[in-house]
């Protein structure tokens, strides 16, 4: 079976842990009818991704899977050369390929990799290695031209990060003797040295007011939507990442993770980025939102430290919610808030609500606290940043403010 177009290679981590080629007849046929190194290097990818899935977050697994999969597909279909024989020039050629892949490798929507047919997994024909979507605020009128696909600088950096890590793993296991991706990175012509002033992706005070008021109105009208209000309030007020509210294989957020110290201060214990466990201060203004969400679930008062009720519970089914489901909740509130603000204030003032993602709530909360004058060190610790310098760079931008202030005094004459 000659492979002329890309097919998915690796399933989700939970399925990869119990992976047998017999369950994937198409892949089995592809590997049995092509050169032996295809299967060998597919297995290298499988071993590496199993390691990543076991030791890193689900988000990191998915990101590394995307990049390892693309790299192997390119080596099979386009380069026709084993990855342990690639040199620096070959990898720079791959970087060019990633910068402008063939339109036949580009899709326009999120798709599952595999579908189940008669008990076996087969490739989803609607899946493609690369994805090009309309900007969030322009989806209705945007026409997608795949020829104009270009990865962002972040996507390009992520590709190098993943493939360099892949090669490092293969070197440690004695499968490879060099890392062409590492050597090629500094000579990749598509990287841009970015020294721009970064705009914080956040909502204005007015936009946040519409989001909160909308969430309150929705919850008042339908008790099931108390969950939406709680999620919105928690992400903004407690500076949470969406994953920190989600159910994960190694962490299940519970009501008991809210706790009170001897001075009656409230805290929330979260399992965050880089497997870091931290405690976040919980302001008094947030407690009524916690209480009303608990009341909607039949839980009385504020949580006790030994309470094991799921923090954000599914309405149907058991257990906590995934990051994907939580994002949908946030998006539903943003959409309604955008509609409300458009009606009252006009489209221009509401535009950011069309662009916003769940992570903007974390940025919004932190930015507002800085404007309020709260000590940067305290905000940094609540955010879970490794250093206060990170918080300053992202939110305060002290040096840029000094430069802007001094720049105002320049004269024309």
Locate the predicted segments by residue.
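N-terminal core-binding DNA-recognition domain of tyrosine recombinases/integrases
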Residues: 45-59, 69-198, 218
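DNA breakage-rejoining catalytic core of tyrosine-based enzymes
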Residues: 192-213, 275-285, 302-307
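C-terminal catalytic core of Y-nucleophile DNA break-rejoin enzymes
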Residues: 272-292, 307-333, 355
